[in-house]
């Protein structure tokens, strides 16, 4: 076995001898070189081991070791110092652990802690587990998951069931690791549980190979994430059952009642020709056939109203009545009216809105159609508007509701009263475009404009007779 002295650096080795040198007078006698015993006089013939152990023990020999020769100076290149020796073990004469510890001491690697050194350390001295496999008893044994470890150990190292345990995957090793490579258990019960894991793996094989497989892929370690993440697994299954129910093994794992999502299932041959694309009747959630559970009133709903594609036509109108009549208990249900009859009326209303100013409920006749005839037998007049007919009837009845306030004259039409008032006021809002003459009524202006048209025609005839049109001139140019 390998026994190592835990030194932090070269200063730890020189601290005690340096203090002894500071308090020792220079007159102390020195050991002559000839009085030094030979290497053969020491047990084992190891002079270097004896010298280092004697200097570390203290006393006069310690002072003499460090005062002999020139003044000691701290070596610059040393990073590790200590004493080691190999002690043969009868049970394992060729144990690879001793060779690994020897190589780690020479190369400056971190050695595995001994049980005495680990027991003597306090929780504050060990902020993190010393060995790479210190977490193995806690990770792979279910009995050790609730053991009481030092508080600083739990602050520095993750727990066995933590979600971040996969980040430490390179440090994990299979459960059949030598017990000597593990952290020392805190109690005899932990020691007995840790001794159950043994195997032929060598330390360097475990460090180089890493952890085989994923986290939680061995033995009892699989139960911990399943137990702690059961709620997450349930939510994932619920999400999968809603998004892709066809991939589930059976109807037992479905979250919705059977038939709840089968409202639009197709039945090609049940509805006759031309109705292969129409889905079947709405099935209530209580049962697959619609006979069990509540919601039996859904059976009478025809398929024409439940089509998600909005199919409407003569076929849906034909089979809806027969379908309701064939169903049990559907004789008292009134057959729905076909929606195909309401569409032409809607189109007509839209055309009426776009074509004219009247609303859809207006009873105005179409343009160029005189639907309002005079009720008087001797009169054959027809009118396109009702207000025109009302004005015409005032001629037959002699009713004159409009009276002038100046001369008290009555008129049957309001426009006649307006033009009459202009005679009293002298207002002439209409003017001729050619001569500028003004008129009180628009019809008077129109008659006057005809006079100018006749004068223009006469002047063009005169110019044509004189030959001005041959020169490219016209009356307008003159």
Swiss-Prot record:
It is found in: Nucleus. Induction: By nerve growth factor. Keywords: Activator, DNA-binding, Metal-binding, Nucleus, Repeat, Transcription, Transcription regulation, Zinc, Zinc-finger. Pfam families: zf-C2H2. GO terms for cellular component: nucleus. Disulfide bonds: none annotated. Its main location: nucleus. Residues 15-37 are annotated as: Disordered. One of its GO terms (molecular function) is DNA-binding transcription factor activity, RNA polymerase II-specific. It comes from the Eukaryota. A zinc finger (C2H2-type) spans 372-396, 402-424, 430-452. One of its GO terms (biological process) is cellular response to growth factor stimulus. Belongs to the EGR C2H2-type zinc-finger protein family. Transcriptional regulator. Recognizes and binds to the DNA sequence 5'-GCGGGGGCG-3' (GSG). Activates the transcription of target genes whose products are required for mitogenesis and differentiation. This is Early growth response protein 4. It comes from Rattus norvegicus.
């Amino acid at each position: 076995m390998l026994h190592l002295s835990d030194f932090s650096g070269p200063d730890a080795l020189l601290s005690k001898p340096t203090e002894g040198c500071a308090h020792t007078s220079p007159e102390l006698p020195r050991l002559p070189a000839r009085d030094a015993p030979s290497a053969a006089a020491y047990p084992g013939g190891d002079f270097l081991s004896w010298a280092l152990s004697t200097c570390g023990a203290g006393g006069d020999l310690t002072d003499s070791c460090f005062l002999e020769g020139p003044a000691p100076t701290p070596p610059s290149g040393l990073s590790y110092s200590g004493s080691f020796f190999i002690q043969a073990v009868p049970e394992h004469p060729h144990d690879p652990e001793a060779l690994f510890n020897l190589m780690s001491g020479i190369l400056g690697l971190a050695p595995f802690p001994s049980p005495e050194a680990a027991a003597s350390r306090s929780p504050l001295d060990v902020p993190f587990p010393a060995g790479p496999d210190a977490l193995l008893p806690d990770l792979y044994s279910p009995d050790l998951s609730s053991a009481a470890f030092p508080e600083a150990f739990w602050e520095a190292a993750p727990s066995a069931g933590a979600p971040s345990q996969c980040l430490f995957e390179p440090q994990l090793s299979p459960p059949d690791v030598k017990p000597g490579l593990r952290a020392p258990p805190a109690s005899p019960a932990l020691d007995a549980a840790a001794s159950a894991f043994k195997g032929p793996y060598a330390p360097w094989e475990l460090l180089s190979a890493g952890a085989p497989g994923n986290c939680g892929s061995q033995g009892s370690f699989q139960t911990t994430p399943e137990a702690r993440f059961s709620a997450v697994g349930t939510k994932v299954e619920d999400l999968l059952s809603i998004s892709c129910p066809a991939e589930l093994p059976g109807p037992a794992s479905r979250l919705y009642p059977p038939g709840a999502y089968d409202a639009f299932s197709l039945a090609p041959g049940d509805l006759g020709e031309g109705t292969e694309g129409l889905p079947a009747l709405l099935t209530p959630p209580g049962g697959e056939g619609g006979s069990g559970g509540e919601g039996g009133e859904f059976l009478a709903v025809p398929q024409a109203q439940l089509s998600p594609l909005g199919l409407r036509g003569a076929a849906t109108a034909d089979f809806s009545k027969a379908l309701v009549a064939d169903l049990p208990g559907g004789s008292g249900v009134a057959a729905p009216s076909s929606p195909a009859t309401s569409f032409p009326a809607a189109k007509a209303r839209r055309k009426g809105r776009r074509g004219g100013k009247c609303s859809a409920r207006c009873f105005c006749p179409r343009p160029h159609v005189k639907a309002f005839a005079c009720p008087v037998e001797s009169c054959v007049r027809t009118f396109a508007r009702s207000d025109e007919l009302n004005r015409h009837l005032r001629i037959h009845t002699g009713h004159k509701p409009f009276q002038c306030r100046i001369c008290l004259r009555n008129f049957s039409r309001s426009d006649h009263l307006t033009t009459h008032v202009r005679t009293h006021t002298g207002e002439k809002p209409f003017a001729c475009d050619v001569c500028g003459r003004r008129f009180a009524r628009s019809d008077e202006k129109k008659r006057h404009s005809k006079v100018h048209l006749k004068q223009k025609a006469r002047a063009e005839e005169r110019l044509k007779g004189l030959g001005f049109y041959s020169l490219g001139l016209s009356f307008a140019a003159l």
